[in-house]
Amino acid sequence: MASPAPAPPAASSSAAGSAPPPRIGLAGLATMGQNLALNIAEKGFPISVYNRTAAKVDATVSRAEAEGALPVLGHRDPRGFVLSLSRPRTVVLLVQAGRAVDATIDALVPYLDAGDAIVDGGNEWYQNTERRIEEAAARGILYLGMGVSGGEEGARNGPSLMPGGHIDAYNNIRDILEKAAAQTEDGACVTFVGPGGAGNFVKMVHNGIEYGDMQLIAEAYDVLRRVGGLSNSEIADVFAEWNRGELESFLVEITADIFTVADPLDGSGGGGLVDKILDKTGMKGTGKWTVQQAAELAIAAPTIAASLDGRYLSGLKDERVAAAGVLEAEGMPSGLLETINVDKKMLVDRVRQALYASKICSYAQGMNLLRAKSVEKGWNLNLAELARIWKGGCIIRAKFLDRIKKAYDRNPELANLIVDREFAREMVQRQNAWRWVVARAVEAGISTPGMSASLSYFDTYRCSRLPANLIQAQRDLFGAHTYERIDRPGSFHTEWTKLARKSNGAAI
């Protein structure tokens, strides 16, 4: 049981002394944790903060004072931190996923009481959250795994929040989360996602869609640059213009900004910083988890998978440079395989259409994965509500999420976004431009794995008769796996080799 004698805070802002005891505390004061704590305090909720290193506690309290004397109480030991909170206590963790979460929980649990709650706001593997829910329940402690999206700026000014686990833990701080979350015309960008590890799983898929989005945008840039010869300044203008239309989104907006930034280390001031960045993309694992889950649930997610493969291949920088040298020595051109004379305005418009259609495929794949997992786990995920809370604060926030929400509102059992009437119409209208862009990229030798995978996904999904019949015949021949017929029910097996030899003999 917790002691009734909490230690005084090690440091606090001037406003904290007159504030009531906090209902909520936050442990883990790296960039995301510090900014979320200040966000909560700015919304009028006193908050206690704790970190293993005292310097980050002091830095957070100093920021709280500098940013408006926000009610933040800093603690340097877990006991004083926990006992500073009024009951039922809620402790938010924003530490590195995995062992660090378990270690932080172990440090805090001795001072928590039954009915208190732990909220893990990291990018955690959902099964770890489900394990911790059971462990916490054995002590009478409530637990939430809460996805937090929006990066540093979102954490400070309003993220998208995806909590899942014990609904009582959510209800205890619902008012706080609704104030701290990003706000749109449809309300706060937070909702109780579902039980168990639902919140972390939804955030994982959000990140998988994010991988796809970023890959598609990078491919659009590459085609504009290499086929159209657009300068960084022109590309900045293109993305800024796109952000005023159907492609309006956080990622398109920041892409436009990136192309306006000069290299601060270039004395001439003429070079773009983006051109000096090594072409190796980092990752933290959520994209890989998304692709693994899609495979386990038999959900096709080729756009997201292509984006993950793209990151893997980008990491092979030395191998790619060596391969280019070997192939050039054998006669492979070092530049474009084919020079394409194209009007820039037409190219920009067609790339816009290809990017939009490809993005729909990426979101469709993510939504289908969410539904499949929801069915498997009995989470009863509301896809329209998830689209709603992604409209603001998060990295994949986009104008067309409102239309995705409406599509699932119209039909919660929608098989695929591609067959929603509105999106279907747009896909058909854009397919010619989409095909043109992918074809020109192939002709020129420009890699567009995301757009190509998206187009193949679209063509495969709309095809009423695939060549899978031949694959099933092959499986039956070498493995006796049987097959179904289109003209009668049941499973069938054929002695293919015997019949083929007999047929070949008869032909001779």
Curated annotation (Swiss-Prot):
- Where, in this chain's numbering, is substrate bound? N123, S149, G150, G151, H206, N207, Y211, K284, R311, R475, H481
Catalysed reaction equations from the record: 6-phospho-D-gluconate + NADP(+) = D-ribulose 5-phosphate + CO2 + NADPH
Q: Induction of this protein: by what?
A: By drought, cold, high salinity and abscisic acid (ABA) treatments.
The keyword Protein biosynthesis belongs to this UniProt entry's keyword annotation: no
Q: Which UniProt keywords apply?
A: Chloroplast, Gluconate utilization, NADP, Oxidoreductase, Pentose shunt, Plastid, Transit peptide
Indicate the enzyme's highest-level EC class: oxidoreductase
E.C. number, please?
1.1.1.44
Q: Where does it live in the cell?
A: Plastid, Chloroplast
Quaternary state and interactors: Homodimer.
Q: What is this protein called?
A: 6-phosphogluconate dehydrogenase, decarboxylating 2, chloroplastic
* Source organism of this protein record: Oryza sativa subsp. japonica (Rice)
